Amino acid sequence: MRTATKTRVTAETSIELSINLDSAAESTIATGIGFLDHMLTLFAKHSRINLNVKADGDTRVDAHHTVEDVGITLGICLKEALGDKASINRYGSTYVPMDESLGFCALDLSGRSYLVFDAELTNPKLGDFDTELVEEFFQAVAFNTGMNLHLRVLYGKNTHHKIESLFKAFGRALREAITINPEIKGVNSTKGVL
């Protein structure tokens, strides 16, 4: 079974995170940051990954450390759960509309970390949440998974809708990439390793 559990404790945060790539059981997410909880719930639903997160962070300062550390821990768990990546599709991409907004995600579980984030988030805050942290979250996930991740908002007006379309697109593209394909023998690379 493709699962991973990680506890990550720093002077700024304490994160407990577990994933099961092959279970769509209901997720439990409690980061102390309402907007992040909402986005992670959407991600879990659309990726069909069971995701459980408990985070305590120095949110009295701001949400930055918690958002980034949840992303780091999610990336570490994804990398561990994927193991040698035998027989996975490796690539995934999708467009997701959210009302007037259209988000796009393409990713490659190549073992090479890179993030392209092209999203104009015109509203700097949604409630208490700094929208610039969305890019920080995806950077942390991509670099700790070893994932080449491209995210783009093609158009839209509402910042919440733009971000939501990206999290849903990320989930759906990741589901495509991690799906085991019986036609792929070994890893999906001419190098023989990912």
UniProtKB/Swiss-Prot annotation:
Record-stated family: Belongs to the imidazoleglycerol-phosphate dehydratase family.
Cellular localisation: Cytoplasm
Catalytic activity as recorded in UniProt: D-erythro-1-(imidazol-4-yl)glycerol 3-phosphate = 3-(imidazol-4-yl)-2-oxopropyl phosphate + H2O
GO-annotated cellular components: cytoplasm
Protein name: Imidazoleglycerol-phosphate dehydratase
GO biological process, one term: L-histidine biosynthetic process
Residue intervals passing through the bilayer: none
Pathway assignment: Amino-acid biosynthesis; L-histidine biosynthesis; L-histidine from 5-phospho-alpha-D-ribose 1-diphosphate: step 6/9
SUPFAM superfamilies recorded: Ribosomal protein S5 domain 2-like (SSF54211)
GO MF assignments: imidazoleglycerol-phosphate dehydratase activity
Domain of life: Bacteria
EC annotation from Swiss-Prot or TrEMBL: 4.2.1.19
Keywords: Amino-acid biosynthesis, Cytoplasm, Histidine biosynthesis, Lyase
NCBIfam families xrefs: PRK00951.1-2, PRK00951.2-1, PRK00951.2-4
One Pfam family per UniProt: IGPD
Source organism of the structure: Listeria welshimeri serovar 6b (strain ATCC 35897 / DSM 20650 / CCUG 15529 / CIP 8149 / NCTC 11857 / SLCC 5334 / V8)
